[in-house]
UniProtKB/Swiss-Prot annotation:
This is COMPASS component cclA. SUPFAM superfamilies: Concanavalin A-like lectins/glucanases. It comes from Emericella nidulans (strain FGSC A4 / ATCC 38163 / CBS 112.46 / NRRL 194 / M139) (Aspergillus nidulans). Gene3D superfamilies: 2.60.120.920. Residues 57-69 have a biased composition (Basic residues). GO terms for molecular function: transcription cis-regulatory region binding. Disruption phenotype: Impairs tri- and dimethylation of H3K4. Leads to increased production of several secondary metabolites, including monodictyphenone, emodin and emodin derivatives, as well as two anti-osteoporosis polyketides, F9775A and F9775B. Its main location: nucleus. It is found in: Nucleus; Chromosome, Telomere. Residues 1-19 have a biased composition (Low complexity). The lineage of its organism: Eukaryota, Fungi, Dikarya, Ascomycota, Pezizomycotina. Residues 157-376 form the B30.2/SPRY domain. GO terms for cellular component: chromosome, telomeric region; Set1C/COMPASS complex. Belongs to the cclA family.
């Protein structure tokens, strides 16, 4: 539509029919019209014209329905909450459990009457310490069993004196308190006597084969490779800095503690760092040593642990503890129902047990990773009602010594460990119910533990002679014993538990022929598998009676009082009775007896 106004008159500002020239057509308009005759009407305000630079205004984003419900909004439209169903705890107390019927296995082989062979060791590295003036050879354990994936492994030996359970507990050389081959990662290297450990990899932890359950026990650890002393540092690099040849951490740990990290990273371990002498628990480091003091090569650290009697411990985990009437003094002795739900199997040429291991509880795992000092379910205490794993032991503590000098007691009120504070990972019956997760196998407690990093190495002594003698008694008059004494005590406990299992199996499954070991009798007179009483009389290494052997030969010694290490290229198989082996103890003869023809219908007699 054409405009009715003259060419020079101003255009009405409100007319929508006014010509609006686009900037692209500006050159054409300038050629046909004069500069003074052009008029532009103002464009109506619009959001798009204000965003010519590409900047868009922010849009108020509304939270989703789930977020609003989580924040407590939209209560009217929120769906009703589901009623929580209480899960019944089907676990049976350890005192009420009985033996499980063993899994049907074949008759024991003749080779099962022999003790397990010594572990094969391959040389890995040699460590030398200028401060101590000594060197150590470390070896890699070949084809070893490792406690992992919720299972724990031990060794068995066939015994004719146990016709119902057929096998009893035993161990591998060396026969003394030491670091456990099975309770350590594959990266851990051992000395020949298994008293020193090291690793060239990141943090790994090795636990001992003895544990403390009650009483006061002590062990010492000497740093072989770690933070160098000031004299060595000045000589090596000419400065006052203290370089290191690795790092170590020392302490105590339970079976739930992870072995691929350092001791003290969770609630199941208590440790001390070599750097600044800091103590560690729940991943929290606290200063303990005086400022500027560390643990260096050649230092000897003494670890003293004190635990209350098992009678008081049971009251705490059962929830019947009363601080007004229950004290730290041991009460009347009570029997402990040791339940070992084990599955026998052959591994290589040895016979082994597989049993459930304990696993970390959710409460302690959450508490370890919780940044708050006081969790929502209450602080750990002997009277914590949330969960037995959160209960602590009154009167328990860990005291640390350095070179014979008491540095203090950084840890008190240790966590309880008796079931149900500790639970088996696979404590289920045939129906999948966790009825047996509270079973106590007699080896749940606090173990000496050492962590190594990047070449750090530690040597331990679990019994005398000590580098620095421990105190004879605690401040409360409790006698102090070397934790190595637990080794012989554990042997007695194992033999007693085997006898109880045999008697219970005989009563439960009566009318079973006792001669079920396939008449596997040693033919040489006086030579055979030793029963429980013989082990107690003859000692740990008395798997054979050397006084009754027909011919003997001296065992090859390595100069340290123990038998030589079996190399990887040697034959590791049990071929028969003529294939005998050294037991790893000094002056133990090796029998060389030809195998006579097996007598017919030879009756078996119980020892």
């Amino acid at each position: 539509m054409a405009s009715t106004h003259a060419a020079g008159s101003p255009a009405p500002s409100s007319s929508i029919n006014s010509p609006i020239l686009h900037p692209v057509n500006a050159s054409v308009s300038n050629a046909s019209l004069g500069e003074g005759s052009i008029r532009f009407s103002p464009a109506p305000p619009s959001t798009f014209s204000n965003q010519g630079d590409g900047v868009r205004s922010k849009r108020n984003k509304r939270d989703s329905r789930k977020k609003r419900e989580a924040k407590g909004l939209d209560q009217e439209s929120a769906p009703p909450k589901k009623k929580s169903v209480a899960v019944l705890n089907t676990a049976i107390p350890s005192s009420d459990l009985g033996i499980l019927r063993p899994i049907a296995v074949g008759e024991p082989r003749h080779s099962d009457l022999f003790p397990p062979q010594p572990r094969q060791l391959n040389f890995a590295v040699r460590k030398m310490s200028g401060v101590i003036g000594q060197s150590w050879d470390f070896y890699e354990v070949v084809d070893k069993l490792t406690n992992k994936n919720g299972f724990r492994y031990s060794y068995a030996i066939a015994d004719t004196d146990f016709p119902h359970i057929k096998y009893r507990q035993t161990d591998v050389p060396p026969y003394h308190a030491r670091f456990s081959f099975e309770d350590s990662p594959a990266a851990i290297l051992f000395s020949k006597d298994a008293l020193a450990v090291t690793t060239n990899e990141p943090w790994h932890t090795a636990r001992a084969n003895v544990c403390a359950r009650e009483g006061t026990y002590y062990y010492e650890a000497r740093i072989i490779s770690g933070i160098m002393s000031s004299s060595e540092a000045t000589t090596s690099n000419g400065s006052n800095a203290l370089p290191s040849r690795g790092h170590v951490r020392l302490g105590f740990a339970r079976r739930e503690a992870d072995l691929d990290v350092n001791v003290g990273v969770d609630c199941y371990g208590y440790g001390i760092r070599d750097v600044n002498g800091e103590v560690v628990n729940r991943m929290r480091c606290e200063y303990f040593f005086p400022k500027g003091e560390s643990i260096r090569e050649g230092d000897v650290i003494g670890m003293l642990i004190t635990l209350p009697p098992l009678s008081l411990h049971r009251k705490i985990v059962e929830g019947t503890y009363d601080p007004a009437c229950d004290n730290f003094k041991p009460g009347p002795a009570s029997a402990t129902n040791i339940i070992r739900d084990r599955i026998p199997f052959h591994y290589k040429n040895d016979f082994c047990w597989q049993q459930s291991n304990v696993f970390p509880t959710k409460q302690l795992r959450d508490y370890a990773f919780n940044l708050k000092e006081t969790p929502a379910f209450g602080p750990p205490s002997p009277l914590n009602a949330e969960d037995p794993s959160l209960r602590t032991l009154p009167g328990s503590s860990i005291t640390i010594y350095k070179n014979g000098i008491k540095m203090g007691t950084p840890f008190k009120e240790l966590y309880a460990f008796l079931p149900p504070a500790s639970r088996l990972a696979n404590g289920t019956n045939n129906l999948g119910l966790g009825e047996r997760e509270n079973a106590d196998d007699g080896m749940i407690g606090y173990y000496p533990a050492v962590s190594c990093y990047g070449g750090g190495a530690v040597e331990c002594r679990f019994q005398g002679p000590w580098w620095f003698s421990p105190p004879s008694a605690t401040e409360n008059g409790e006698p102090v014993k070397g934790i190595g004494e637990r080794f012989d005590e554990q042997i007695v406990e194992d033999v007693l538990a085997d006898i109880v299992d045999e008697v219970e199996a005989m009563l439960v499954w009566g009318s079973v022929d006792g001669n079920v070991v396939n008449n596997a009798e040693m033919d040489a007179p006086g030579v055979g598998a030793v029963g429980g009483t013989d082990v107690l009389k003859g000692g740990v290494g008395a798997a054979y009676d050397p006084a009754t052997t027909l011919s003997t030969a001296p065992a090859e010694s390595n100069g340290s009082g123990t038998a030589s290490i079996k190399l990887a290229d040697e034959d590791a198989c049990h071929t028969g009775f003529e294939d005998t082996m050294s037991l790893g103890v000094a002056n133990t003869p090796i029998t060389d007896v030809p195998v006579p023809p097996e007598p017919e219908d030879t009756p078996m007699t119980g020892g």
